[in-house]
UniProtKB/Swiss-Prot annotation:
Keyword ATP-binding: yes
GO molecular function: ATP binding; ATP hydrolysis activity
GO CC, alphabetical: plasma membrane
Protein name: Protein transport protein HofB homolog
Keywords from the named record: ATP-binding, Nucleotide-binding, Transport
The family this protein is said to belong to: Belongs to the GSP E family.
Signal peptide range: none
Entries under NCBIfam families matching the protein: PRK10436.1
InterPro entries cross-referenced by the UniProt entry: P-loop_NTPase, T2SS/T4SS_dom, T2SS_GspE_N
PANTHER family documented for this protein: PROTEIN TRANSPORT PROTEIN HOFB HOMOLOG (PTHR30258:SF1), TYPE II SECRETION SYSTEM PROTEIN GSPE-RELATED (PTHR30258)
Pfam family membership, one: MshEN
Highest taxon in the source lineage: Bacteria
Organism: Escherichia coli (strain K12)
Binding site for ATP: G222, P223, T224, G225, S226, G227, K228, T229
Length: 461
């Protein structure tokens, strides 16, 4: 193990690497070394371990003297295996990937990039290179490099091409080795503006109206990777003024924003969503953002906060706006509580955008049942070009927005079923996700095939 890896290992267990020669590794700790540090060092190196005990003041003095810089992805650029990490991370950035998959396979490691929601392969690498790549990533993420049997999660920031880039790392034991997934976290410089989310004018007006209310619950729903986080952060940015106290509880904090009080949960330390929420309510908040409502206890705290003078924003994993009511009921939340707290529900998905440089209309238009969409849809194709490579470039969001009007509130209280509730909402002007998808196809933003890939056909069609 090289010096940067040993340095990171010592820092993980609250030590400082003083020196590493061919025979001895010299480490400083406060008071006495932990068993975890000694075990990790003995696993990582066969050299003799020498421990120097410092006072806490000495350790703090060393930390203040040490220049705090971001680690580069790879120091040993002359080594092909080390260069692999830099090439992989750089490729992900250049191709706008959201995730990097590193997977053990038979006689090789497979590397794939998720670009605009679809996985694209990079060249396979040898097992030795794959193992070395995994080990380096675990060191960067402050994971236990000696643990191969249990999943681990972490986060790290590296310097690539002169810029700080943050990643979330998750490992999973698999047949043949450990699978690693890296998620590229949103950068602080990203524009967060509700006006650029892609909502239709009426949807945007309903969203803005809900954010202007002094209290209530606003929910954003959809599967993982559907853009909920950006929608929530854009709403928080709109509300982020000097006269409003905004507090959030997240897992993890994906986009640090100046002016917000953002707390990351730490279940192993006893810092849970429920515990942080109870503490937040004693912090005189005006707006509370909950990264995700995962259980009935969190849902109940959120709803009570929304009923007592707080604007609460959160997310759920449901397929549509109306199905959100069923999901919360399954968590044990009574309908009367929902009807009094809810102000707006947003469902959303991301679809790939057609490349404007190579898109073409092909053949006959696409006919679908009139009760789904009243007119034929254009048949778009994009073969790919030097601008996009795959026919698509970027993604756009489709939204379904359900404002909780007095009529909808009464229907919720009366335990109206989901189908009837959706019928009333559509009669009042709500467009479903699929209808907004058809509108996007008409406008040439995406293809009908992409719409079906993401949403499928409506039930019964």
């Amino acid at each position: 193990m090289n010096i940067p890896q040993l340095t990171a290992l010592c820092l993980r267990y609250h030590g400082v690497l003083l020196d590493a020669s061919e025979e001895v590794v010299h480490v400083a700790v406060v008071d006495a070394p932990s068993h975890e540090l000694l075990d990790a060092l003995h696993f990582a190196t066969t050299k003799r371990i020498e421990i120097t005990c410092w006072t806490r003041q000495q350790m703090e003095g060393h930390a203040s003297r040490t220049q705090q810089t971001l680690p580069v992805a790879v120091q040993e650029k002359h080594q092909p295996k080390a260069e692999l990490l830099t090439r992989t991370l750089q490729s992900a950035l250049e191709q706008r990937a959201s995730d990097i998959h590193i997977e053990p396979a038979d006689n090789a490691y497979r590397i794939r990039l998720r670009i605009d929601g679809v996985l694209h392969p990079l060249p396979d690498v040898s097992p030795d290179a794959g193992v070395a790549l995994t080990a380096r990533l675990k060191v960067l993420g402050n994971l236990d490099i000696a643990e191969h049997r249990l999943p681990q999660d972490g986060q790290f920031t590296v310097e690539l091409a002169g810029n700080a880039v943050s990643f979330r790392i998750a490992t999973l034991p698999c047949r043949g080795g450990e699978k690693v997934v890296l998620r590229l976290l949103q950068q602080v410089g990203q524009a967060l503006d509700v006006n650029t989310l892609g909502m239709q004018p009426l949807q945007l007006a309903d969203f803005a109206h809900a954010l202007q209310q002094p209290q209530g619950l606003v929910l954003v729903t959809g599967p993982t990777g559907s853009g909920k986080t950006v929608t929530l952060y854009s709403a928080l940015q709109k509300l982020n003024t000097a006269d409003i106290n905004i507090c959030s509880v997240e897992d993890p904090v994906e986009i640090p924003i100046a002016g917000l009080n953002q707390t990351q949960i730490h279940p192993r330390a006893g810092l849970t969503f429920q515990g942080v929420l109870r503490a937040l309510l004693r912090q005189d908040p005006d707006v509370i953002m909950i990264g995700e409502i995962r259980d009935g206890e969190t849902a109940e705290i959120a709803i009570k906060a929304a009923q007592t003078g707080h604007l609460v924003l959160s997310t759920l994993h449901t397929n549509s706006t109306c199905e959100t009511l069923v999901r919360l009921q399954q968590m044990g939340v009574a309908r009367w509580m929902l009807s009094s707290a809810l102000t707006l529900v947003i469902a959303q998905r991301l679809v790939r955008k057609l490349c404007p440089h190579c898109r073409r209309q092909q053949g006959e238009p696409i006919h679908i049942p009139d009760n789904v969409w009243p007119s034929p849809l254009p048949h778009w194709q994009a073969p790919g070009c030097v601008h996009c490579y795959h026919g698509f470039y970027g993604r756009t969001a489709l939204f379904e927005v359900l404002p909780i009007t007095p009529v909808i509130r009464q229907l919720i209280s009366a335990n109206t079923d989901v189908e009837s509730l959706e019928t009333h909402a559509r009669q009042a002007g709500m467009r479903t996700l699929f209808e907004n998808g058809c509108l996007a196809v008409e406008q040439g933003l995406t293809t009908f095939e992409e719409l079906i890939r993401v949403l499928g056909m409506p039930h019964g069609e």
